[in-house]
């Protein structure tokens, strides 16, 4: 613990907490200050000046990062018949119906993404209390309730991320690993930023992006100048 604290102090000394860095500077600092012994994830965080209590200011969606996330996604699909076969052919890790519902209700959660065809939502809805709090419930807005299960599986395997503003207007997203080349992290960051910018509600008032930052797992939070994106 003392060693980790020493590493954190050393990392903090390299970052000016009063400064908003350019995206290139921020990414370089994330890589430089990372002290995790594993290939840490890199995440961005946005504090948006929105009121999610208003229906027209709720922000939620999905996108495919140009350079992927570096994370292997275990994809579960609720489908039957031909659609189940399509999901398997596309690379889904788990495909089923009521059998999967029973397994999940029994405590099994070894998957990262859940996709369902519309006709399966009647049985998937039984898992609301399990999947909902974990942000795993299939939703049309994130492309996880769809008849095109093959495309959904391929996108999830290929770097698709989902995002959602919480009650305080905060949005977090994984954009890669510290092992990524800096230019690939920058490209992923800019792609996500573009999505956030376009998601601005027409009724939002004041400065839309109150704060933007980037960090690695166990790392230091680094402020980013939105204008550099």
Curated annotation (Swiss-Prot):
Pfam families associated with the record: Ribosomal_L1
InterPro entries: Ribosom_uL1_bac-type (IPR005878), Ribosomal_uL1 (IPR002143), Ribosomal_uL1-like (IPR023674), Ribosomal_uL1/biogenesis (IPR028364), Ribosomal_uL1_3-a/b-sand (IPR016095), Ribosomal_uL1_CS (IPR023673)
UniProt cross-references to PROSITE patterns, sorted A to Z: RIBOSOMAL_L1 (PS01199)
A GO CC term attached to the entry: large ribosomal subunit
Gene Ontology MF annotations: rRNA binding; structural constituent of ribosome; tRNA binding
Record carries keyword Glycoprotein: no
Keywords associated with the record: Repressor, Ribonucleoprotein, Ribosomal protein, RNA-binding, rRNA-binding, Translation regulation, tRNA-binding
GO-annotated biological processes: regulation of translation; translation
Family, as annotated: Belongs to the universal ribosomal protein uL1 family.
Reported function: Binds directly to 23S rRNA. The L1 stalk is quite mobile in the ribosome, and is involved in E site tRNA release.
Complex and partners: Part of the 50S ribosomal subunit.
Protein name: Large ribosomal subunit protein uL1
Species for this entry: Streptococcus pyogenes serotype M28 (strain MGAS6180)
